[in-house]
Amino acid sequence: MAIKKYKPTTNGCRNMSVSAFSEITTQTPEKRLLVSHKDQAGRNNQGKITVRHRGGGVKRKYRLIDFKRNKDNIVGKVATIEYDPNRSANIALIHYLDGEKRYILAPKGLTVGMQIVSGKEADIKVANCLPLMNIPVGTTVHNIELKPGKGGQIARSAGSFCQIISREDKYVLLRLQSGEVRKVLGTCRATIGEIGNESYKLINYGKAGKKRFLGIRPTVRGSAMNPNDHPHGGGEGRAPIGRKSPMTPWGKKARGVKTRDRKKASNALIIRRRTK
């Protein structure tokens, strides 16, 4: 993906960059694969904020993505590569020989006209989907299932991938980009290749207003709040936080405390913890 940089003609354009959308082949999505999507603004079913700094933003339609890739042994042809406002990766519209149309995540190297297929006997080429046990060691994969038939859960964002490093009985060992090494059942499916749009992380939005279009609200420092709103709040002028260590808004230590549940079932499947 190419990045388009702007000249500093205004303060908002200074250092701003956007995607050049050179890979996008159409601006009109498939209408039958769109559903309405109401933004929850970070609230749960009780109306309480569970994710801070969310709200507003432009209205979007949700694209139904085929994460399961369970249409076995039916060849599909790539019709379009499209922009998806709900994720960092691009998506591809697939026309199958039986007439069905589905969206999939667009991997790097996928172009209009290519043919893809899912199934145990599928070839090892970009965008084909197979069980992990049928994929050679050393192959990079994305959209990886953690439970057979549930659909891909790992490596779905722009530029993401995992590498198969070995096999152990009914498990396959994957190395994630974070450095974590994890066991996954060999019957779980994965798609060959890495997600495209890998330059997404280089985009500079240039001004706060573009973040507001995405539904991201400002992050206020705790020291700028009142003491009833944050442990760092209060004091005269620019006062220090007045604590031995930084605190979360709920009064817990914000640094050096492990947040993962010790009794989480998947702990047994993690061979090496992430390094970053």
From Swiss-Prot:
Any matching Pfam family: Ribosomal_L2
Subunit record text: Part of the 50S ribosomal subunit. Forms a bridge to the 30S subunit in the 70S ribosome.
GO biological process: cytoplasmic translation
Function (record text): One of the primary rRNA binding proteins. Required for association of the 30S and 50S subunits to form the 70S ribosome, for tRNA binding and peptide bond formation. It has been suggested to have peptidyltransferase activity; this is somewhat controversial. Makes several contacts with the 16S rRNA in the 70S ribosome.
GO cellular component: a single term: large ribosomal subunit
Basic residues compositional bias, start-end: 252-276
Family: Belongs to the universal ribosomal protein uL2 family.
Keyword Zinc: no
Key words, A-Z: Ribonucleoprotein, Ribosomal protein, RNA-binding, rRNA-binding
Family matches, as InterPro entries: NA-bd_OB-fold, Rib_uL2_dom2, Ribosomal_uL2, Ribosomal_uL2_bac/org-type, Ribosomal_uL2_C, Ribosomal_uL2_CS, Ribosomal_uL2_dom3, Ribosomal_uL2_RNA-bd_dom
Name of the protein: Large ribosomal subunit protein uL2
A molecular-function term among this protein's GO annotations: transferase activity
Originating gene: rplB
Region annotated Disordered, chain positions: 221-276
Alphabetized HAMAP family for the sequence: Ribosomal_uL2_B
